């Protein structure tokens, strides 16, 4: 099928507008950006139903074609069903295929065999996450290899991810493009009152409550002493989850568990007015929550690993266990000048590396290379003029 210029299909997310994680937010930003620059953009959207009545339908949202795919399956099987139906439908439509994540990469060879151009964001190293049982980790491991070899072009959102992918494909096949963010220069303090909080009198963690995000380490470290400040742990807790119960049991009376908050204005206010942001992620690349903390000017206390060191730069105090985390928290709560320096460094780092426009332009250059009449081989594809990402 001959591909016209400036036509893109985005798959791998639940759809737009964004109601879930970082990939959905990126898909919305990128689709709107391209639509405003004359591209024909379609985004696949998952529609969960009890009974399939209309397998595929489309509408137009803010200049973007949304392709709704119905699935009656639940959980992981529903996601796979959706991924397969997206691939099958994409065979009937022109355009470069931008795939966000590799969880359903087993179906990508169908696109390549049909001569389609595939550009895949490889996300984090999902198969390393301890929360997954062995069969699921094996599935992700195999899919990572399939995506790496099926896609003409790979994107890593962090240099360490690009290094990892170089064990699967030639390094020339991968371009580094991180996640983006927007400056937060003000936010109302009103949302804090409902949680019993005062500006600059608390620190905040915003993450899924999972072992590889070190939530238990953070809660134990904060609760090791009387702080005179509060720790806000934002995330969904489940009553039947043993790890969640352990986190709650470790908390002092200065720890607040508001649950999951999906109102972006409230989350933005919680970040902006926090004395520091605690980030325990250990697996993945450029984490959206950490980028957003930098844009909010947060002093950062982060787990010491290559992902967080590169992303936060000089804006972070680093920890690797309960003791070092407790020491970093105590330092951030006691030293006003240090917090000011870290806050300034956070904004400088965000402006230098994580502007949305830089990110979106870099993605567009890659898609243009793939959409060109003869296509771009990995070694020929355009590199972003941003050496700080390499």
Residue ranges of each PLM-predicted region?
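Conserved donor-binding/catalytic core segment of Leloir-type glycosyltransferases
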Residues: 9-10, 194-226, 232
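Short hydrophobic beta-strand element within catalytic cores of glycosyltransferases
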Residues: 276, 295, 299-302
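A short, active-site helix/loop in glycosyltransferases that binds the activated sugar's phosphate group
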Residues: 147-175, 181-183, 363
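Aromatic "clamp/platform" in nucleotide-sugar-dependent glycosyltransferases that forms part
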Residues: 282
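Membrane-proximal helix-turn-helix segments that form the acceptor-binding/catalytic region
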Residues: 91, 137-154
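An aromatic- and histidine-rich active-site surface loop
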Residues: 78-123, 127, 285
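Nucleotide-activated donor-binding/catalytic signature segment of Leloir-type glycosyltransferases, i.e.
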Residues: 244-265
């Amino acid at each position: 099928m001959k591909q016209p210029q400036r036509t893109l299909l985005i798959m791998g997310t639940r759809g737009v507008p964004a109601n879930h994680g970082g990939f959905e937010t990126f898909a919305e930003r990128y689709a709107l950006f391209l639509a405003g620059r004359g591209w024909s953009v379609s985004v696949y959207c998952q529609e969960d139903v009890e009974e399939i009545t209309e397998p595929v339908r489309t509408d137009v949202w803010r200049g973007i074609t949304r392709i709704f795919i119905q699935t009656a399956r639940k959980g992981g099987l529903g996601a796979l069903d959706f991924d397969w139906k997206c691939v099958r439908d994409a065979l009937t439509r022109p355009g470069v295929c931008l795939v966000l994540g590799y969880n359903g990469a087993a179906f990508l060879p169908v696109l390549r065999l049909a001569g389609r151009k595939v550009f895949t964001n490889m996300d984090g190293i999902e198969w390393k996450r301890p929360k997954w049982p062995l069969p699921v980790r094996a599935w992700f491991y195999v899919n990572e290899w399939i995506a790496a070899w099926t896609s003409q072009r790979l994107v890593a959102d962090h240099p360490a991810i690009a290094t990892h992918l170089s064990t699967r494909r030639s390094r020339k096949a991968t371009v580094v493009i991180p996640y983006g963010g927007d400056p937060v220069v003000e936010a109302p303090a009103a949302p804090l009152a409902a949680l019993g909080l005062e500006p600059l009198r608390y620190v905040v963690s915003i993450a899924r409550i999972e072992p590889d995000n070190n939530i238990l380490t953070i809660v134990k470290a904060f609760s090791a002493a009387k702080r005179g400040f509060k720790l806000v742990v934002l995330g969904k807790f489940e009553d039947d989850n043993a790890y969640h119960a352990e986190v709650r049991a470790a908390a002092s009376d200065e720890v607040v568990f508001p649950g999951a908050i999906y109102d972006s204005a409230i989350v933005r206010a919680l970040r902006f007015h926090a004395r520091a942001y605690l980030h325990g992620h250990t697996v993945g690349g450029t984490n959206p929550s950490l980028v957003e903390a930098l844009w909010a000017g947060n002093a950062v206390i982060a787990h010491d690993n290559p992902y967080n060191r590169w992303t936060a730069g000089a804006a972070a105090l680093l920890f690797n266990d309960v003791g070092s985390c407790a020491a970093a928290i105590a330092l951030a709560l006691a030293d006003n000048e240090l917090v000011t320096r870290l806050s300034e460094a956070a904004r400088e780092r965000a402006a230098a590396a994580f502007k949305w426009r830089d990110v979106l332009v870099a993605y567009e250059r890659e898609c243009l290379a793939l959409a060109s009449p003869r296509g771009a081989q990995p070694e020929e594809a355009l590199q972003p003029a941003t050496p700080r990402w390499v």
